[in-house]
Amino acid sequence: MSERDAQGATDIEGIMNLLPHRYPLLLIDRVLDFQPHEHLASIKNVTINEPFFVGHFPQKPVMPGVLILESLAQACGMLAFKSVQDTLTDNDVLYLVGIDKARFKRPVQPGDQLRHDVSVRRVTRGIWIFEARGSVDGELAAECEIRCTVRTV
């Protein structure tokens, strides 16, 4: 499988080349669409085998809201890193600076495919500001505004 196809999709190998996250906190499975400095769409296939379902909640498994936000933040990271990947070094990391206006509209459960749609609102003084939405079967599950910055470590 190739890293990229004609629509800007990226497979898991390409994702792991850009994001430092690994199991159990790598929360993106595939990038579906990418427009540099504008938009990225990706998915997380949610399965009952996720480690967080052991305790959240055993009788009615629901993906924790904080992990939904983390998956959206990782999609924002992919958008930023894919947009500037020609200028990145191996020591560059994207740090989460803040999350505002977070709202949860429906639970995300095993068997769901969580779709991330993230867009750049603006980049100001090194801070990327994104609009982020997560949906399942076209129904809004969560939305927020995410701020990130690239730093060399």
From Swiss-Prot:
The protein's Enzyme Commission number: 4.2.1.59
Per the Swiss-Prot or TrEMBL record, the active site comprises H56
What catalytic reaction does the record list?
a (3R)-hydroxyacyl-[ACP] = a (2E)-enoyl-[ACP] + H2O
Primary location: cytoplasm
* Top EC class, one word: lyase
- NCBIfam families for the chain: fabZ, PRK00006.1
Q: Which family does it belong to?
A: Belongs to the thioester dehydratase family. FabZ subfamily.
Q: What does this protein do?
A: Involved in unsaturated fatty acids biosynthesis. Catalyzes the dehydration of short chain beta-hydroxyacyl-ACPs and long chain saturated and unsaturated beta-hydroxyacyl-ACPs.
Name of the protein this chain belongs to: 3-hydroxyacyl-[acyl-carrier-protein] dehydratase FabZ
Q: Which organism is it from?
A: Halorhodospira halophila (strain DSM 244 / SL1)
